[in-house]
Amino acid sequence: MAKIDNAVLPEGSLVLVTGANGFVASHVVEQLLEHGYKVRGTARSASKLANLQKRWDAKYPGRFETAVVEDMLKQGAYDEVIKGAAGVAHIASVVSFSNKYDEVVTPAIGGTLNALRAAAATPSVKRFVLTSSTVSALIPKPNVEGIYLDEKSWNLESIDKAKTLPESDPQKSLWVYAASKTEAELAAWKFMDENKPHFTLNAVLPNYTIGTIFDPETQSGSTSGWMMSLFNGEVSPALALMPPQYYVSAVDIGLLHLGCLVLPQIERRRVYGTAGTFDWNTVLATFRKLYPSKTFPADFPDQGQDLSKFDTAPSLEILKSLGRPGWRSIEESIKDLVGSETA
């Protein structure tokens, strides 16, 4: 573990992590605890964090505490739980994959603004990290060349499609999810520009995240949960609807959040979590290579390739500053996933 020089948040500082029971959030918590920080994690009920609380009590005694926020849209929802925090990682969002705009986009925006308002009213907060997604920049378009995505890229198309596509369209829920991430992040930057609070905002934009599932009871519906289902021979029709795209290790996503919270040179940045491209046949080929004695489903029909390119210079700077030479490979990420589920 690399020592963090001139950290914005001194070691031992308290960080509030919203939606801490989620797959990505649990990896953010893990990296914060591993690097000497204290974490207050929220969930809609204490039971949703019970297994993770036991894990972290055993591994990092006295450094993680559970806080219940039943409704992130309620006025003042975070006002009490944020007290004493030096940093905030707002990860809680709507992941129902409903195709109804008002059920997904509206609460995503409202929850984000609620957390920002609470931070603005809390003098101890120095950094705020919003978990966005690469879909706030673009939904992957297979076999299309010349797409380059940087910190100025926004998926404005998703907002229109989320509002206008018929509910019978099988891709509608994906566009609604993308709109929720796009609009919530845009609302966050607008809040910062208009209110000029005392803290710094950074955003982390992960793509398909693969890694250890810390709590199978609550995280089976995550991206890694879907991949594990394929490992176990279940071919969900939903997988065929997911285009080729980028993957990223959950470890690296945890580190990117950590860097956005504590590294002084990372300010007002949109940081992509895009290690490399994959499709389901890449995953199946990796399964067969790593676990040759196991039988896996047949390959999917050719889905093409994601030919887009992302500006990952800020991401790689963070990883290097935290002692990592670069991205974890898809093989390492899949080993992390399968090992956690078969141990």
UniProtKB/Swiss-Prot annotation:
Optimum pH is 5.5. Its EC number is 1.1.1.2. GO terms for molecular function: alcohol dehydrogenase (NADP+) activity. Inhibited by quercetin and diphenylhydantoin. It holds the Pfam family Epimerase. Keywords: NADP, Oxidoreductase. The keyword Repeat does not apply. NADP(+) binds at Y177. It is an enzyme of class 1 (oxidoreductase). It catalyses: a primary alcohol + NADP(+) = an aldehyde + NADPH + H(+). Optimum temperature is 40 degrees Celsius. Catalyzes the asymmetric reduction of o-substituted aliphatic and aromatic aldehydes and ketones to an S-enantiomer. Reduces ethyl 4-chloro-3-oxobutanoate to ethyl (S)-4-chloro-3-hydroxybutanoate. Belongs to the NAD(P)-dependent epimerase/dehydratase family. Dihydroflavonol-4-reductase subfamily. Monomer. This is Aldehyde reductase 2.
